[in-house]
Amino acid sequence: FSGYESRPAFPTLNSLIETMASVGQEYGCGRALWEYDRDELGSYGTPMAPMLLPYWTDGCIGSMEGLYFESSATVPFHFLMQSELSANPSRPMRGLTYRGLDLNNGTRHLQMSGERYYMAFSEQAVGKARRFPDRLELIARSDPWSIYRVIDADLIEGLSHEPNVSEEGITGGRSWTDPSTEWFNDPTRWDVLIASDGPSHWNRVDVLNQMSTVRARFAPSLERPLAAVSVTEIVDEGERISFSVDRVGIPVVVKTSYFPNWSAKGALGPYQATPNWMIVVPTEHEVVLEYGATWVEYLGWLITVIGVGSLLVGARRKGRKVHA
């Protein structure tokens, strides 16, 4: 390994890093998804080089792939997006229905996922990006990269329709992933999010084709329009997210990966929702989500303390016997 700086393409990588740092200062912090290409990214030292954007920008520009790569249930949806937004995608996960370069669906997925920036370099991707000025705003260039701000990609927003709840919930394996990826690839389903749990008055839907060779999918949703709600004062601090709403009782989606460690103050939930975001139902005008320890972590710490204590006691007794 010779390091990034010794690579012939280091000036290109360094310029990209400096450009993204400036973009964050001018247009705000947020997650970025870049076009994948093994040769282009590999020339920087590793295809994973852009994953260091959070490091080089002091956490301002989040790396979509670096944040979620092999670490959460968001992974398959990232790679479905990467395939739509890259001329030569990696497609590392098997069992997914990948699309080729498709910026129509790719940009809509960027919006629904709260991705703030899209970075493209190939002639094919940049050419197609020009067709969607209402979704992608070209804000910077760093040869060969074009940097776009994704329009209407709020991190938190009110839902237009009441969520439906999967009757299966989360039962392990691919019980959530398979029907959720089918939902993710079907634009006709996007108005109604499917949750793994929720209030009793939310409609329940079955999961179809579970025992067949056809991929499992959610049954048709019941569409119940919701009143509009305004979400303001959004503050994302990583393990703490806060925001305000102008009315309570209307579900909002938080486009951050769900995990059981999240808890909500001033709202019901959070409930896991397609593809892998969180839904909360505000009960107060100020809502706070925090990521903290659960009984699993506390149990692990207790076992660790007991284990270390047992080793120390055993070592002390052994020392006394030797001394005697």
Question: What spans do the regions from the language model cover?
Answer:
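Short beta-strand micro-motifs in enzyme catalytic cores
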Residues: 1, 144-148, 241, 276-279
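Extracytoplasmic/lumenal acceptor-recognition loop(s) of multi-pass membrane glycoenzymes
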Residues: 1-7, 20-111, 154-155, 159-225, ...
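Generic recognition of flexible, low-complexity loop/linker segments
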Residues: 16-23, 51, 104-109, 134-136, ...
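Beta-sheet entry/capping signal
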Residues: 29-32, 115-117, 145-147
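Short, hydrophobic beta-strand segments that form beta-sheet elements in well-ordered domains
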Residues: 33, 116-121, 252-253, 272
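Short, polar loop motifs at secondary-structure junctions
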Residues: 121-126, 257-260
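Short acidic, glycine/proline-enriched helix-loop-strand junctions
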Residues: 125-153
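Active-site-proximal, structured, solvent-exposed surfaces of multi-pass membrane proteins
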Residues: 205-324
